[in-house]
Amino acid sequence: MNSIKNHLMCEEINKRFNLHPKVREAMESIEREVFVPAPFKHFAYTLNALSMQAQQYISSPLTVAKMTQYLEIDHVDSVLEIGCGSGYQAAVLSQIFRRVFSIERIESLYIEARLRLKTLGLDNVHVKFADGNKGWEQYAPYDRILFSACAKNIPQALIDQLEEGGILVAPIQENNEQVIKRFVKQNNALRVQKVLEKCLFVPVVDGVQ
């Protein structure tokens, strides 16, 4: 029954955003309900962002689909996500990338996300409790880096951990609004490849809790 609901959810997403076949397949493979807190299970297959603990949110599935597709997913191997949250975005990425690395700074969210991902048998997803601004140097460089929270700027540590020619997608705070930008690394520096759309994400915060 859930897979039918998930399929219908993807139909709704595709009406609003033309899904790459790989992204659609990935979205249909991961049941969003698994990542939604119990009080909101009946909203799991809507296109709404839903509240979690610690003043955090599980992103709208439309947003997850867009952010995944904005990474330009063909012919890539590894991705680093900054801000694991519920684990839903990482789970979707796991259906496309061979290796997924995700960092979460809130320990309670990290513990829950890791358990969900393990329960689903997503062995290619690796989750770390740490400050995402420092990245995950052990497995660098990454073909892609995705911010699942809004940054004021991109830390040098993450630029260093991105493969030359690699792509980084992030919501960026600009004055009083947020915009999703796609960057490409050229000559060891990030260049804005495209400003994609306005958005609303929780902010990137330093440190752990």
From Swiss-Prot:
Keywords: Cytoplasm, Methyltransferase, S-adenosyl-L-methionine, Transferase. Transmembrane segments: none annotated. The keyword GTP-binding does not apply. This is Protein-L-isoaspartate O-methyltransferase. It catalyses: [protein]-L-isoaspartate + S-adenosyl-L-methionine = [protein]-L-isoaspartate alpha-methyl ester + S-adenosyl-L-homocysteine. The active site is at 59. Its EC number is 2.1.1.77. GO terms for biological process: methylation; protein modification process; protein repair. CDD domains: AdoMet_MTases (cd02440). Its main location: cytoplasm. The lineage of its organism: Bacteria, Pseudomonadati, Campylobacterota, Epsilonproteobacteria, Campylobacterales. Monomer. Catalyzes the methyl esterification of L-isoaspartyl residues in peptides and proteins that result from spontaneous decomposition of normal L-aspartyl and L-asparaginyl residues. It plays a role in the repair and/or degradation of damaged proteins. Belongs to the methyltransferase superfamily. L-isoaspartyl/D-aspartyl protein methyltransferase family. It comes from the Bacteria. GO terms for cellular component: cytoplasm. It comes from Helicobacter pylori (strain ATCC 700392 / 26695). It is found in: Cytoplasm. The keyword Protein biosynthesis does not apply.
